[in-house]
C-alpha cells in the first residue's frame, strides 16, 4: 500500500488545525501510520528542503519551519500521494479550491499550513528522514469496507 509524508507547518499548529487536518485524511479512509509533534532545528529543515536550496525563498522557508512546532505524519492508502495533494490544495492558497485544506485555512503562499509529498519516491525518502525508526504496522478493520 502506498504511503505519503504530510507535515502540518507551524502556522497550522498555532491555528489549532491539527485535529481538523487529521480528520480529513481519516474520513477519506487513509490510515495514520506515524505521528510526531516536534520543533526541528535549522540543519534538519535544510536537509528536508534540500531540493529547494537554490531557490530565492529557501532561507525564509527554513526560518518559517523552525519557528514553531510541526506535526509530521505518515499516511497510508490507495493513491494516497495524489489524493493527499488534492485534499491539501494548490501550493498557492489563492489557487486552492474551497474544500481543500489550503483553500479553507490559508491565505498566503508563505504560510500555507501544510506540506505533502509530491511523488511516491520523494515520500519514501522523506519518511526515512523523519521516521528513521519506522512507522506502525497495523491495518484498520475498516479496510474491507473501503478497498475492493
Swiss-Prot record:
Its EC number is 2.7.4.6. It is an enzyme of class 2 (transferase). GO terms for molecular function: ATP binding; metal ion binding; nucleoside diphosphate kinase activity. Keywords: ATP-binding, Kinase, Magnesium, Metal-binding, Nucleotide metabolism, Nucleotide-binding, Phosphoprotein, Transferase. The active site is at 115 (pros-phosphohistidine intermediate). GO terms for biological process: CTP biosynthetic process; GTP biosynthetic process; UTP biosynthetic process. InterPro entries: NDK-like_dom, NDK-like_dom_sf, Nucleoside_diP_kinase, Nucleoside_diP_kinase_AS. It comes from the Eukaryota. Its cofactor is Mg(2+). ATP binds at residues 9, 57, 85, 91, 102, 112. The keyword Nucleotide-binding applies. Pfam families: NDK (PF00334). It catalyses: a 2'-deoxyribonucleoside 5'-diphosphate + ATP = a 2'-deoxyribonucleoside 5'-triphosphate + ADP; a ribonucleoside 5'-diphosphate + ATP = a ribonucleoside 5'-triphosphate + ADP. Belongs to the NDK family. Major role in the synthesis of nucleoside triphosphates other than ATP. The ATP gamma phosphate is transferred to the NDP beta phosphate via a ping-pong mechanism, using a phosphorylated active-site intermediate. This is Nucleoside diphosphate kinase A.
